[in-house]
Each structure stands twice: as structure tokens, then as C-alpha cells.
Amino acid sequence: MIDIDGSYGEGGGQVLRTSLSLAAITGEPIRIAGIRAGRRKPGLAAQHLTAVRAAARICHGELQGDALGSTMLEFIPGGGVKAGNYIFDVSEVQQGGSAGAITLVLQTILLPLALADGDSHITLRGGTHVIFSPTVTYIERVYLPMLCRMGIKAQVKLGAWGWYPRGGGEVNLQVKGGCQLCGLNLLERGELKRVQGLAVATELPAHIPQRMANRAENLLRTAGLRVSMQALREKGVAPGAGIFLTAEYCNSLTGFGGFGRLRLSSEKVAEIACGQLLQFHETGAPVDEHLADQLLLPAALASESSQYRVAEVSTHLTTNAAVIEKFGLGKITVNQAERVVAIASDKT
């Protein structure tokens, strides 16, 4: 059994998700102590508990410690990952429901199912666009297209928007099984082709997304960027608003967003998202801070070595690297000065 210190590094949910994915893929049993010890509320929250049970379900695994607030977990995978049709609902594990991010559940089970024999269809319910988590828009426009370059074939379709704190969102995920992962060489991003933006509001007046879109378009065009904005007013179970920007370079993709909240103007929401994008643009890096740690796992499982340059070497990145190396999957080197991540696959 592989023992993993959940308090290591940034001490968040990434340690848990990566460990679950690799345990399901390799069949290695794991024991995690100090789960999310670095967070204000340690232990398993609704989205983490859903990810734990989802990982166990797809490989008929056994669990101990799978409860809300638990800081200790044992996971013994069963007889390999089984492709199929699954439904995972974050709101079911917590009385009164939850807007926990379904994208975190998605990222936990995606690679195990992509490497399994047979195709899978998964319905995920909960929060689709939640602060401090990848949004479904980011998954659709950045994460999955980048993984496609490495051999992962998956698609997501948004069925219903789910904002904090109500949730109520739904996503359908289709995963092609039997994928063969290849390496990624991404040291230069090339010229910026365009920025695509989506400003959306549910159960709110139409002027809110339009104002976000107008402000973002003005800011980005003033900065000399080519931009195309779309403003949408959608139906939803609760009010919510946000703006989501995707920058397409010749060799890479990146995405940033901002969320509406009380006493924050639509224009300010757009300014927050644009500020993040422009700050990244100035770094010249191909890979944003968040995608940097998300690419580590597929790179470690690939048949070839990988290297990519990042905007920032975060503790999420170095923590994820340490967890992956616990499973003996190649060697990960992070050059802090050059901001280059190199993954030497053990399959080469």
C-alpha cells in the first residue's frame, strides 16, 4: 500500500485527486492521511467525497474513511477500470445539496476511463462554474483540447448551468477508451491568434452579460488583442453570472474567468478576467499556472517524454509532481529559473 501525506506541499485536493486517479489506473492500494490539511476546512468536502466514490465505482474498489470531513482514506482498487455509463451527483453526498465543482470529479475519472477498454458516458451534476475550480468552459475550451494533443479523446456538453451556492448544473462527458498517450513538447506558444469570450447570466437581466462583454472587448482591443465576445442570457435554477476568456495561440491554449457577485459591477467582473489574461500574456509562456499541474498526470502516463514552459511554478505543480513520483511513473524535473517542466517517461 502506498502511503501519501495529504498535508504535503499545498495540502489541498489535488493530492487526493491525483492519488485516486493513479490508484485506479495502476491498481495500487493507497492510504492518504491529512487530507486537505492546508485548507480552512480540512477533510473531504462534497466534491472530494464524490470523486472518491466515483474512482471506487469505476474500478469496483473498496473504501474506508469515505465520509464528509474525513481526513483519512484507504482505497483498494478492484479488478481494473470498467468503461460504461455512470452518473455522479455532488449534491447527493451532502444534506441540503451542494454546488461542489463537478469538474474536479471529471478530472479524477477522465484518465482512468480513457485508458480503459471501451467507451464511457458520464453524467455529472453539481456546480459547473465555481470559483477556485476549473469551470466547465475551461474544461471544454482549454483542458480537453490540450489533452487531445496527447491522445485523450473526450467531449463535454453543458446541460445546465450550476453556480455557487445552489449548484444544480449538469454536464455530459463522453470518453473514448483505449487511448494511447503521447508526449507534449511545448516550449514556445507562438503568436496570439484570437481571444474568444463568453459572458453569461442565468435568471438575471440581459444587460449584465452584455456589459461584461462590452467592457472585456474594449479592454482587450485597447491592449492590441484580437477578440470576439458573445453575451448570453440563459435559464438556470438560480441567478448567476460570469465571463470566461479563452486565448488561442499558435501552439497553445489558455483560459481565465471572473464571477459576478453582490456589489460587484459587471464591468469589474470583466476587468478581473481581462487582468488575469493580460498578465499571463505578458509572461510569454505557453502554459498557464493551472494547466501546468493538470498536464503532469497525462504526461507521466505517456509513452514519450514531455517538456513545457509555464507562466509560474506553483506549489500545486510541485506537489502534484511529488505525488506522481510516489507511484514510480518516471522522473519529473522542474527548472525554477527557466520555468520548464520536464517529464521523463518510464516507458521510453
UniProtKB/Swiss-Prot annotation:
SUPFAM superfamilies, alphabetized: EPT/RTPC-like, RNA 3'-terminal phosphate cyclase, RPTC, insert domain
The family this protein is said to belong to: Belongs to the RNA 3'-terminal cyclase family. Type 1 subfamily.
Keywords: ATP-binding, Cytoplasm, Ligase, Nucleotide-binding
Recorded superkingdom: Bacteria
GO molecular function, one term: ATP binding
Record flagged with keyword Transferase: no
GO biological process, one term: RNA processing
Active-site residues, Swiss-Prot/TrEMBL: 316 (tele-amp-histidine intermediate)
Enzyme Commission number: 6.5.1.4
Gene3D superfamilies (alphabetical): RNA 3'-terminal phosphate cyclase domain, RNA 3'-terminal phosphate cyclase, insert domain
Subcellular location: Cytoplasm
This protein's encoding gene: rtcA
Main location group: cytoplasm
Binding residue positions for ATP: 107, 290-294
GO cellular component: cytoplasm
Protein name: RNA 3'-terminal phosphate cyclase
Catalytic activity: a 3'-end 3'-phospho-ribonucleotide-RNA + ATP = a 3'-end 2',3'-cyclophospho-ribonucleotide-RNA + AMP + diphosphate
Protein's job: Catalyzes the conversion of 3'-phosphate to a 2',3'-cyclic phosphodiester at the end of RNA. The mechanism of action of the enzyme occurs in 3 steps: (A) adenylation of the enzyme by ATP; (B) transfer of adenylate to an RNA-N3'P to produce RNA-N3'PP5'A; (C) and attack of the adjacent 2'-hydroxyl on the 3'-phosphorus in the diester linkage to produce the cyclic end product. The biological role of this enzyme is unknown but it is likely to function in some aspects of cellular RNA processing.
Originating organism: Trichormus variabilis (strain ATCC 29413 / PCC 7937) (Anabaena variabilis)
